[in-house]
């Protein structure tokens, strides 16, 4: 997250996080809370009317490729997507994703989990940039789409 200063969120992640992160002021999550609360957030949704209930939030409800191009052409650091599997899938399908970082946890999840990739998704080839194991067994895998 140190390389990013702008956050893209989908509707569900925004709705959930907007009710939580503004309330975190201390403890082990305080650093992340300050970063996410202070950073510009762009919320991609076709159903929300407003995102004013979380500071520094802007609604994107129109042409996603044009909005992403405008964000990329602006000044600042990287743009990151937090959570939001539906948004990640849409960005990948539209070739709007420059890098994909997956956290691979050493567990097998059963029902109730939303899949990142749809069964009918178009084949997208990815190039492994790095794979970093953590002390908890999580692997942080970074990929770039091949174009």
Where are these regions (language model features)?
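Enzymes that bind and transform nitrogen-containing heteroaromatic metabolites
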Residues: 1-147
């Amino acid at each position: 997250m140190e390389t990013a200063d702008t956050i893209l969120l989908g509707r569900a992640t925004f709705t959930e996080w907007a009710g939580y992160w503004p309330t975190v002021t201390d403890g082990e999550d305080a650093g992340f809370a300050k970063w996410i609360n202070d950073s510009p957030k762009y919320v991609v949704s076709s159903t929300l009317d407003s995102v004013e209930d979380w500071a520094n939030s802007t609604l994107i409800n129109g042409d996603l490729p044009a909005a992403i191009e405008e964000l990329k052409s602006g000044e600042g650091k990287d743009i990151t997507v937090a959570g939001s599997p539906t948004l990640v899938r849409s960005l990948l399908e539209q070739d709007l994703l420059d890098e994909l970082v997956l956290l691979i946890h050493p567990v097998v999840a059963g029902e109730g989990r939303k899949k990142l990739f749809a069964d009918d998704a178009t084949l997208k080839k990815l190039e492994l940039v790095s794979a970093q194991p953590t002390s908890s067994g999580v692997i942080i895998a970074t990929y770039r789409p091949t174009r």
